[in-house]
Amino acid sequence: HNPEDWQTIARINKLTAPYIIYADGEIEVPLSLLKMEELSLEVVTVSGKAVLQRENGKGAALTQGMRIAPGETVMTGEESFVQLLFPNGVYTRIDPESALTLSYLLSLADGKIKAEGLLSKGKLTNTLKKQLRFNDSMRTRTPVVITGIRGTEYRLKADGERSATVETLEGVVSVQSGSKTVRLRADQGLKAQEG
C-alpha cells in the first residue's frame, strides 16, 4: 500500500534495526494492510435448537445450509449441537449450551485462508481432515487462551471468563495464554487459568 506500512509492522512486532525476520518466524500484520476477500462458513448440521445472532443484534433460528459471516454468533441450546464447515476444510462441532462468534474469515490475495473464532462459553471440537496449506491459519480464542491448528483434531472448552481446557485428539495444537505458548500433541491437554 504505502511505505509507512513497514513502520507499522515493525512497531507491532517490536522489530528494531536492522529489521531482520528469520525463516519460519511469525510476524503480525494488521488486517487493514492486507488485500483480502471476506468469506463465510457453511452450516452443515443442526441438531436441536440453535440460534444465529447477527451483528445487528437480531437473532434467527439456525438451519442447515445457512451461511455465517464474520461478526455473527452461533448459540446452541440444551441437548443441541451444530457442525460448521470452513472453506479450508476444517469442521467445527459446537456442543450444547455454547456460543461461538466468527471474528474473521478471509482469503488473502494469494488464496491463503485466515480464520478466527471466539468461544465465549461452552465447548467445541475442531477437526481437520488434511493438513492446512502453508500460511493458512485457523485460530480459536476463549477469554483465557488462543489455540491454533497445527494438527488434525482438538477440543476446546471455555470454562467461564477465567479458565479454558484444551485437549488434543490427533496431531499438534499450538496454545497461547498470555506470553506463553505450548504445543500439545495427541492425547495431551491443559487447563489454563487467568493470571
Identify the role of each PLM range.
Residues 3-38:
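Extracellular LysM carbohydrate-binding repeats and other cell-envelope/extracellular binding modules
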Residues 23-26, 32-195:
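Flexible, surface-exposed loop/linker segments and immediately adjacent secondary-structure boundaries
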